[in-house]
């Protein structure tokens, strides 16, 4: 599967607005939910109900929780159907996202270019998965700094672009030029724009990947882009509301999880023999998140009935348990 560039979503060929994306999403909802809809597409009134619920999504963090509902199958419930002779269900729940359908299944992938908003801003590139604007990309010339692109996203947020509307579904922001690229989880508030959580992509040897062609192939192509806003996204439902957020894994964490998968399932050797191994993380590099994601991954695979987490200091026990509970809420 690869990204498809439809003329109807190309703002360099015709005017494309956020409303255009919303109408495209409506078609995707009808496709994904054909059985639930009993072959009768959403009416204007029914889709208005959907949009009312979308406009209640405060920010990207709340959207992340919605997308992770019911074993990572995002849903919107409580939609009442209009009378129709072929409709037997009075109320329905619509599926909007399936994390497990990476590079196949029912997932679709489209690129929208030069998308105008009602605030007069223009999004350079929006990557749509099942019609949802999950990844936003801001492009700059090589003589411009990536900080300028970062501040541009910050300004968009200040003007209301990513709150209580369709664009609140954004989960990852990418700032890029021909010679440099960085990514970060879409902040849940203006105060959460923090350059300390802006990462570069790197390969398995931890060598930074910067050239735009390499970034496309190694980071923004399917399946990796879908995985970044699915498998490699962590929702932290902390006790304190100010600490609640969603996070994207850093590249070395992604490579670590892939290495663990290869070792545990025997995918990294020609004989297909599972074997052990270890992941080397330094202090402050996200060991707890990597451990949680490892345990979660193995627990979903056949042949792994129990995952044991061993800590070498007593004070780490309660701290790790608290973190795992926060990560496991969604």
Model region roles, listed by residue range:
Residues 3-306, 315-330:
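ATP-dependent helicase/translocase motor core
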Residues 309:
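Conserved, well-structured core segments
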């Amino acid at each position: 599967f690869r990204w498809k560039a439809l003329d109807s979503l190309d703002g360099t060929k015709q005017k494309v607005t956020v409303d255009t994306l919303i109408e495209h999403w409506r078609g995707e909802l009808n496709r994904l939910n054909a059985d639930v809809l009993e072959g009768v597409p959403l009416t204007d009134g029914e889709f208005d109900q959907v949009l009312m619920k979308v406009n209640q999504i405060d920010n990207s963090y709340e959207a992340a929780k919605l997308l992770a509902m019911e074993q990572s199958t995002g849903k919107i419930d409580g939609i009442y159907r209009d009378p129709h002779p072929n409709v037997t269900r009075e109320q329905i729940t619509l599926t909007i996202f399936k994390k497990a359908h990476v590079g196949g299944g029912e997932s679709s992938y489209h690129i929208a270019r030069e998308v105008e908003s009602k605030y007069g801003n223009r999004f350079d590139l929006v990557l749509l998965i099942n019609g949802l604007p999950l990844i936003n990309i801001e492009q700059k010339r090589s003589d411009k700094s990536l900080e300028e692109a970062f501040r541009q996203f910050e300004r968009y947020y200040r003007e209301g672009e990513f709150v209580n509307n369709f664009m609140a579904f954004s989960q990852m922001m990418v700032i890029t030029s021909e010679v440099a690229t960085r990514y970060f989880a879409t902040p849940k508030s203006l105060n959460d724009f923090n350059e300390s959580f802006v990462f570069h992509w790197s390969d398995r040897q931890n060598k930074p990947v910067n050239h735009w062609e390499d970034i496309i192939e190694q980071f923004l192509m399917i399946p990796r882009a879908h995985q970044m806003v699915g498998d490699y996204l962590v929702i932290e439902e902390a006790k304190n509301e100010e600490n609640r957020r969603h996070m994207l894994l850093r590249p070395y964490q992604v490579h670590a999880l892939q290495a663990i998968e290869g070792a545990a399932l025997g995918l990294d050797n020609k004989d297909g023999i599972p074997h052990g191994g270890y992941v080397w993380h330094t202090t402050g590099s996200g060991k707890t998140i990597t451990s949680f994601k490892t345990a979660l991954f193995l627990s979903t695979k056949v042949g792994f009935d129990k995952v044991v987490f061993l800590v070498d200091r007593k004070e780490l026990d309660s701290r790790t348990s608290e973190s795992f509970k926060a990560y496991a809420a969604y």
